[in-house]
């Protein structure tokens, strides 16, 4: 709505202050000095000086003299630390008798609380059973046991933040909670790290040590890293029951693993067989599917691999001619990405309907290297439109070829050894060569013999060992396998029937697909670190071709009894050799939900807390860990190990990249919590196990991502930020600046409590919450918002969507309590006599608000809650961690949705008032305000909130102008709606001669932005609505400036100067 013309304004309002019919003002505590006083003159002179300086700055920006963004970025430096320095023994309660420090300091807040929580037993279900709010219900979870290969990363912190928030909420609402801590021995990963460390520090290979000596080294590593992981979990505030801590290689776990193996074997679900497995030549062990990284290559790519002196080329298709036997000029050209496996070829296959090869069906080809005849076979698995339509068949080194070979009765030839060198079957000229060195030699010979037909780029997926970086080979090995079809079908049916709930539900599709295509699980690993397989070979002479005799037992004595039964010979006469291999780490991990509770013994914990109430973990572990827990748990205990699964997304950096050591973007939670400078980050890299080439790349990437280091953010800010990302969304893109912003939120809460404690005073006695009744509309509004926050938190926890909880808490603390109520109540608290209602409301907001916050920010909530005075009549809880969580129903009597709806109208007025002040640069003046509305109900609403309107709008007196009354002269006007206006006093508060050039400079700047946006071609992916919103916002701001300039010229009571720009 345009401003009214000059003629519509009345004379300066204060000249008619006592005239009949003029509005009455509700005065507030802030009043300006009379305009003629010396103080007023000095204030105006100072204000004019500031405005001149601001004008010069704007003009410099227009002239292009402003600093570039890079110049304005400051490096982070640790601030002066505020530390808790009162002598307190570990486990003693923190001394909170002193005043709160002036600013929030994470190190001060987080000191001393955790040891006290543990010593008091707050995290034990036995303690929780005695709480006044005890429900008699149980809630049990186990932490996904982190690998002892190193320290926790940000993905672990996300798991802890989500699980601990849920656990603390259940504990506060009165459930008996058991959250079991533990760590995983991580067989391949740990052995690889220790081997790398031994070589780096002492130049020793594993095979140069005895098995016992090497295992001592690994146990030393475990003790060091296991302790470090526990300290990290404590630093994150994880409320685990440490008396029940377990490790997947401790005695109890070993008993459970052996029992599970024996039971599965007796049930016919475990067998030994000779078949293809994923083989890491660098580790000399079979590995699980989860340890295989399927890396897509767009075409020719060179990779550095362990044991290779030079980079190896991949993403190439080599064409090789196989001569037709008996026809010197006939050949079949085969394309392959693995020419090093040519010595293992036993046939060439074509599609039976491919007319190009119909005349060769049943014919023999000649091996291009060995010269022996090879059959040309037909198989429907061949894709005739890929390459030449002819493929070589290598059953010993390809799963697809192994299936084809089995269909056609072809015997495999193993031409690659366990260490990645060529076997004797390749001939003397290749035996012992590294397979990729042999590749070059093979291609050279084929070229020399005229059988090489070309080379071309070929997109492919290359299987890489995630532990060693080596290319995976498929080798035929004698291994132990678990039959998964029957157990997998039960797991699939559990989800389909609803007995097992996966959340988010879109994971159900992957679950069903995986279990409908599941193969048998190879559980043998050629390692020293892990659970040695409880299977024994009966050593005896037998005829060529007879199978070995293997027996399984919980001990050698039991195995000997079984062997005696099988052979019919006395057990004492038999020689048994235990399988040196160990079990896949995922085997023991799959038992964790019940082995951690004492299975196979019938323990009280197993009876009370199994099945678990919830399994929460990363979505990347759905199939490899969750699926296997469901299979083995159902098979071994007769029931699902849990009925609900909550899966959180992967944590990625702000650019959307997976966090990886090789990219240098891994975030250590400790660095975010305590802060770290760049040189320290770089030193941590140098002290790790990266090789020099990797180190240089990673260090450069780290400098780019964190050029000024990482600022100190604190545990509570990190936890809150991680929980604020919804599990229903895609991957979590985390930036340090986001956590730092949450630290500022912590500071807001800190300052709010400092204000509230100061306002309450030492003699304040809180009322019981149920007796508190609001004494003003503002009190009623904030209590209603508090009740709404409790309702939203309860909904978020019940649905396990923690982003709803964080949003509700952030909105209440920041936008309702700090930004509105505390500001509005400040002048009220200094009234004389002091009203009784607001202090009680402030206390309830602090007490209940902190309890709502406690599951997500346990340290900050405890520190501040301990300083609140106790409510009379009942003993307070010793800790906020065991205080009752505010329930929505207990606060329902405070809910007033209609008041909240109407108060949003008041907030609209406040926004208009602040916008007017900003437009006219009224930085310190407190102008008077008039509100005019013909909307029914507005008059009564505004009258009820006159004082808060003046306080929140940074204005002086606020009055009501009757509908239809003439607008005052010399006042700025802004529309509130089609039926309501806001008027603000300007006469004597604004100097038009100073303000007009400032407005012109601001308009010039905005116009440049608008012109640039209009002329720019929309970028790919830029939403049309987003672009239109930017355009509309700039146009609106320009319109406001034009109206303000027009009104300032009217105040000057003279026409625009010739040649001045029209605004």
From Swiss-Prot:
Presence of the UniProt keyword Electron transport in the record: no
Documented EC number(s): 6.1.1.9
GO cellular component: cytosol; mitochondrion
Name of the gene: VARS2
Catalytic reaction annotation: tRNA(Val) + L-valine + ATP = L-valyl-tRNA(Val) + AMP + diphosphate
Entry similarity comment: Belongs to the class-I aminoacyl-tRNA synthetase family.
Basic and acidic residues biased stretches: 42-53
One record GO biological process: valyl-tRNA aminoacylation
Keywords: Aminoacyl-tRNA synthetase, ATP-binding, Disease variant, Ligase, Mitochondrion, Nucleotide-binding, Primary mitochondrial disease, Protein biosynthesis, Transit peptide
A Pfam family recorded for this sequence: tRNA-synt_1
NCBIfam families: PRK05729.1, valS
Pathology linked to this chain's protein: Combined oxidative phosphorylation deficiency 20: A disorder due to mitochondrial respiratory chain complex defects. Clinical features are variable and include muscle weakness with hypotonia, central neurological disease with progressive external ophthalmoplegia, ptosis and ataxia, delayed psychomotor development, cardiomyopathy, abnormal liver function, facial dysmorphism, microcephaly and epilepsy.
Enzyme class, spelled out: ligase
Protein purpose: Catalyzes the attachment of valine to tRNA(Val) in a two-step reaction: valine is first activated by ATP to form Val-AMP and then transferred to the acceptor end of tRNA(Val).
Motif ('KMSKS' region): 658-662
Outcome of mutating residue 337 to I: In COXPD20; decreased levels of the protein; decreased valine-tRNA ligase activity
Residue range covered by the transit peptide: 1-26
GO molecular function, one term: valine-tRNA ligase activity
Subcellular location(s) of the protein: Mitochondrion
Gene3D superfamilies attached to this UniProt entry: HUPs (3.40.50.620), Isoleucyl-tRNA Synthetase, Domain 1 (1.10.730.10), Valyl/Leucyl/Isoleucyl-tRNA synthetase, editing domain (3.90.740.10)
Motif, 'HIGH' region: chain positions: 146-156
Membrane-spanning intervals of the chain: none
Mitochondrion in keyword set: yes
Binding site for ATP: 661
Designated name of the protein: Valine--tRNA ligase, mitochondrial
